[in-house]
Amino acid sequence: MNKTVIKNKLKQESFVPSKKMGQNFLLSNEIKNKIVNVANISKDDLILEIGPGWGAITELLVQKTDTLVAIELDKRLYAHLKTYIKAPNFHIINNDVLCVDLDKLILDYTNTKKNQKIKVVANLPYAISSKIVLKIIQSKLINDAYIMVQKEMAERIGAKVNTRGYNAFTVLVQLFCKTKILFQVNAKEFHPQPKVQSAVIHLENLHNKVDFDIEQVSKFLRICFLNKRKKLKNNLSNIYDIKLVNEMFIDYNLDMNLRAENIEPKMFLELFNYLNKSNNE
């Protein structure tokens, strides 16, 4: 389905993209193929597509895998895809992805006889992309995700320590997986054209799970990055006893002038465990 066909279909069916749902349809055949190719899909892989929209990427994915599961909230697009993609390996759910138990859904379509990898390939709705990313990384079954998000979001997810974009969300995501920005996508490749640029990012090795309470760690990270220009010690002393914070810095041989942006993701988890274990004793 090329850009002319998509635009004509939208016009013929008087389809008005929903701003509330963050609908921007990818038009470029080159970008669609590029996304599918970087995902390195085999027939045995189970592919989960979140927000398939008009089916631009869907029609390529369905040719690559024996099992494609899509989640679409918009009833209009759900009805369109049920008619447009008529393949036995295509399964579509009409629901809000934030309300779906992803692992339960995946298990419904998993073939235990195959050495299946579970991959997410999707152009995410930008309005809720951070919430979807958090849902993906918490899955116990998803191996990899190749997702298109707002460029600024991709840069946050993929930021390195000691860089400006490195923040609490960066650390939380990188505690679950490796991240890599694959390529950027110009706004002109979409209809309607968004006001921001986009990028495709790879969330890799999602089975490398860390056992912690994500809500508690997320709250801790927000405290650490509350004021990025303040010393980490000062941010933490707003919540924890200053004596305990100083003892931790000494025990870990940390510079008292460190800021949150200077610390690697895994170290934050150690600091969290230290402070909360001591608090509970």
From Swiss-Prot:
Protein family according to the UniProt entry: Belongs to the class I-like SAM-binding methyltransferase superfamily. rRNA adenine N(6)-methyltransferase family. RsmA subfamily.
GN (gene name): rsmA
Signal peptide: none
Annotated organism of origin: Ureaplasma urealyticum serovar 10 (strain ATCC 33699 / Western)
Protein name as it appears in the record: Ribosomal RNA small subunit methyltransferase A
Reported function: Specifically dimethylates two adjacent adenosines (A1518 and A1519) in the loop of a conserved hairpin near the 3'-end of 16S rRNA in the 30S particle. May play a critical role in biogenesis of 30S subunits.
Amino-acid positions noted as binding S-adenosyl-L-methionine in the UniProt annotation, renumbered to this chain: 24, 26, 51, 72, 96, 123
Keywords linked to the UniProt accession: Cytoplasm, Methyltransferase, RNA-binding, rRNA processing, S-adenosyl-L-methionine, Transferase
GO-annotated molecular function: 16S rRNA (adenine(1518)-N(6)/adenine(1519)-N(6))-dimethyltransferase activity; RNA binding
Catalytic activity annotation: adenosine(1518)/adenosine(1519) in 16S rRNA + 4 S-adenosyl-L-methionine = N(6)-dimethyladenosine(1518)/N(6)-dimethyladenosine(1519) in 16S rRNA + 4 S-adenosyl-L-homocysteine + 4 H(+)
Enzyme class at the top of the EC tree: transferase
Its EC number(s): 2.1.1.182
InterPro entries: KsgA/Erm, rRNA_Ade_diMease-like_C, rRNA_Ade_Mease_Trfase_CS, rRNA_Ade_methylase_Trfase_N, rRNA_adenine_dimethylase, SAM-dependent_MTases_sf
Subcellular location: Cytoplasm
Organism superkingdom: Bacteria
GO cellular component: cytosol
PANTHER family referenced in this protein's UniProt entry, alphabetically: DIMETHYLADENOSINE TRANSFERASE (PTHR11727), DIMETHYLADENOSINE TRANSFERASE-RELATED (PTHR11727:SF7)
